[in-house]
């Protein structure tokens, strides 16, 4: 069939428009590039490898290689659209420096901490790993080993790693990089609702009358979801978009109301809104009386710093998460000081603007969707901020109904599905269970066929504490998978790098590319990427999606799952468990950790015949390992409000939102008629709490740990840009994305640049007491900070901006604040 260029362009345009509208076009109008008859390309589905939106893409493979990707028109999340990163997914696996063999630091043919990297076999790599792990276990016990994982792990990878650490090695020292992005959201959910993850869903975008972005730049960080907000705003004139941030960015271009606030002052703004609702008789008393309780948080709780830090020592209630029941009148009194005058004074936002924002929440006829990500979570009072937003929605009853939604977005493809739901945090188990609860440990031990007392009750080292323990020589064997924490984490010079290079420690990094973290390691293991393996992710709206392996991996790279399971074969149970445990389970004597964890009659119950022919992990182990792990994991949540569908179902659909009960997904949790766990006649049932009520939690404004001073006179905020994802490990290896934004810059207000006698494009030194970086100045463009604040993205490995970030955390969630620290900028002559 011949087609003119004009007809070709029209057909493509029609197909794109139809996909957005959810329309199926006749075959004659489809995109010819996607026609397998013409190109012999094989197409299959997979969730996108990047952010937590959970877009589905169609992956085109040819001759054993990914050659094209496109938005999946059948996907309810993205409806055929992709963002700029998604359109270049086909290139992320083919960087010229892709790692294909294990690399070990060696000198004179033997391992040496100060040696150079040399290729070795997998057997040699695991031999040295096992030697180091066994020596550490014998000398110091299970608290001397640790693992740092990822919200990019597949569900099965995270589950296998957590099981290996907590059941096999009996160490809770496993944490994901989601500690740096979603931990405050988790604790906020648990404190208010007794159960994690959003009650709303993406359908709220088509139902809300007002959108409020609390410190989120969705236009660049969640661009596909931003198109849904844009469509709603432009097609419904009554809809309002509100954007709150410490600097101007692309999301302001759509905003009806923009608010530039002083760092940390979002606490005061949220408390003012609650006060406004009360003072203007906008409380939904029927909802509040039936469905909420009022509580007061302990205050002056410190900043998650080392115990000997003066700021930590000065705190009256360091790290206290205590909640005290109070009356509504006491709650009213607690927010009364936050008048519009006081909120304006603290935040720097005009009084009229604050009142306009409060009115939208207070109007009973306006359905409001609040949205946030890192701006709120990466905050030394991030848990409080999460709860202050819930307070506003609970006071007005604007929750868990279409368009009324406090919605915590996620930044990684499975921060929800793996880090949170699987429980790869140092204190968690699957399905919101925790290691400190003996009943929860008993459930896990029963499912995993462990003797009582196997799982340690004390939470392990969280991400920031892992760095400190490596630095101090307490944590000695450390395995990093699927993240680049040497570039992404805080306070690199003071804590992390010295810990990695501590002669007492042995650091292993699994990665497809030679990242900053890999280059600081002792052993680097090459990993399979994305569709080089089978897996599942869980996105921000509780949607679990699965995909099949579609191409072979490159060289000798292996999946993170393969690495964990193979490593487990290196240990006999006598080498990892004490005699008293073995006496309770003598059947495990002489068996390997692999036998105990994975050849347990559950994980290995599904025969290889059920797997696809292309499934390297399944064929290596001799059974359908992904299905076995998923089904064992799903046992934790079924019947407990975290129900997942059978594994095979996920390969036939574009994901399902849990809880999935009787084959039906759940759109709005806690709402009778939508959530199968909400009791009949309840209206709303916050069943995560024993009394079925949500907590409204009073918490004040408290200042950040550091503020600008005479020497360090500017605020520094770090973050991302549209074209790159996190540390740029994948996106900077895509030529088109690299060319679009090759280098990080420091975005400055022109007046601040003028004061320092620097011009756009000139190189400056950004410094504070923790380090310094050289970077070029940008005074125009997409990001426009106010005077007194600068913004630098962290994707550029040549500009390790996070060296400057203090490792202060929210004391409750242990999540780092990457959004505010003082710096100075000087011109480089």
UniProtKB/Swiss-Prot annotation:
Positions contributing to [4Fe-4S] cluster binding: 48, 51, 55, 83
InterPro entries attached to this UniProt entry: Asp_de-COase-like_dom_sf, CT_Nitrate-R-NapA-like, MoPterin_dinucl-bd_dom, Mopterin_OxRdtase, Mopterin_OxRdtase_4Fe-4S_dom, MopterinOxRdtase_cofactor_BS, Periplasm_NO3_reductase_lsu, Prok_molybdopt-oxidoreductase
Ranges for domain 4Fe-4S Mo/W bis-MGD-type: 41-97
Amino acids binding substrate: 794
Cofactor comment: Binds 1 [4Fe-4S] cluster. Binds 1 molybdenum-bis(molybdopterin guanine dinucleotide) (Mo-bis-MGD) cofactor per subunit.
UniProt cofactor(s): [4Fe-4S] cluster; Mo-bis(molybdopterin guanine dinucleotide)
GO biological process entries: cellular respiration; Mo-molybdopterin cofactor biosynthetic process; nitrate assimilation
UniProt-listed Enzyme Commission number(s): 1.9.6.1
Sequence positions that bind Mo-bis(molybdopterin guanine dinucleotide): 85, 152, 177, 181, 214-221, 245-249, 264-266, 374, 378, 484, 510-511, 533, 560, 718-727, 802, 819
Keywords (A to Z) from UniProt: 4Fe-4S, Electron transport, Iron, Iron-sulfur, Metal-binding, Molybdenum, Nitrate assimilation, Oxidoreductase, Periplasm, Signal, Transport
Localization terms from the record: Periplasm
Keyword Magnesium: no
Signal peptide: 1-29
Reactions it catalyzes: 2 Fe(II)-[cytochrome] + nitrate + 2 H(+) = 2 Fe(III)-[cytochrome] + nitrite + H2O
GO molecular function: 4 iron, 4 sulfur cluster binding; electron transfer activity; iron ion binding; molybdenum ion binding; molybdopterin cofactor binding; nitrate reductase (cytochrome) activity
Signal is among the record's keywords: yes
Gene Ontology CC annotation, any one: membrane
Post-translational modification: Predicted to be exported by the Tat system. The position of the signal peptide cleavage has not been experimentally proven.
Main localization category: periplasm
Assembly mode: Component of the periplasmic nitrate reductase NapAB complex composed of NapA and NapB.
Function: Catalytic subunit of the periplasmic nitrate reductase complex NapAB. Receives electrons from NapB and catalyzes the reduction of nitrate to nitrite.
Record-stated family: Belongs to the prokaryotic molybdopterin-containing oxidoreductase family. NasA/NapA/NarB subfamily.
HAMAP family: Nitrate_reduct_NapA
Name of this chain's protein: Periplasmic nitrate reductase
Organism: Vibrio campbellii (strain ATCC BAA-1116)
Higher taxonomy: Bacteria, Pseudomonadati, Pseudomonadota, Gammaproteobacteria, Vibrionales
Gene designation: napA
